[in-house]
């Protein structure tokens, strides 16, 4: 079973390999020349950016200091809305609970939104080992699932993959893809992924997603994409 694991002891070896990887350098070079400047531009267009960031930090610190209270409040509100909250003490308990829910519906296919907790507990491999096919629907997660890799970043799971590598991955995995069809730009790659994933959404028996925020007042979950 593949789970995220600490790799600090392998840093020197991994760093040497990464510095010699020209495709990785290309992928990260695009990040440096596009994503970072775009973030700076967006922040500059929001005069209250620093104040909002400070407010978010203070809220996070407060919530972490009272997490037991807010989790119980969240559970209460979820139950009032007819939902269920399952408490799991460790990764194995969480995996077994997910499997129990899937088996209750005789699920054969599960579509997944991005969930770092799912990565941490190795839910994809666990489901596959138990006869349930997990299908990632976040584009970055879908790409690395096809490549059988782990995420390179919590926000951009496939930041380390170039467009050329994505094209090669799709041509290998999508066996019905026309060999003459161009997949040279981001728009065509996204269209190909969208066409495949739309059908998987419709076929799925169960859906799994993470959450960026849990709202204790209402029992709601918030996903930022």
Sequence positions of predicted segments:
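The feature marks the mature, well-folded catalytic cores of soluble enzymes
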Residues: 1-225
């Amino acid at each position: 079973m593949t789970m995220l694991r600490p790799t600090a002891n392998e840093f020197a070896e991994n760093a040497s390999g990464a510095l010699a990887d020209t495709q990785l350098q290309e992928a990260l070079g695009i990040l440096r020349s596009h994503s970072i400047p775009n973030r700076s531009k967006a922040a500059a267009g929001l005069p209250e950016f620093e104040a909002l960031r400070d407010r978010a930090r203070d809220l996070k610190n407060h919530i972490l200091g009272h997490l037991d209270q807010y989790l119980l409040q969240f559970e209460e509100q979820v139950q009032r809305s007819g939902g269920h909250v399952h408490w799991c003490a460790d990764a194995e308990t969480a995996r077994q609970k997910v499997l129990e829910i899937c088996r209750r519906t005789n699920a054969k296919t599960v579509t997944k939104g991005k969930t770092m907790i799912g990565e941490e507990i190795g839910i994809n491999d666990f489901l596959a080992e138990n006869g349930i096919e997990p299908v990632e629907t976040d584009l970055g997660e879908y790409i690395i699932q096809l490549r059988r890799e782990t995420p390179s970043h919590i926000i951009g799971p496939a930041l380390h993959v170039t467009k050329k590598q994505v094209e090669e991955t799709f041509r290998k995995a999508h066996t019905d893809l026309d060999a003459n069809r161009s997949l040279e730009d981001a728009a065509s790659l996204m269209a190909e992924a969208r066409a495949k994933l739309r059908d998987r959404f419709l076929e799925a028996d169960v859906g799994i997603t993470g959450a960026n925020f849990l709202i204790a007042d209402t029992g709601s979950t918030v996903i930022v994409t």
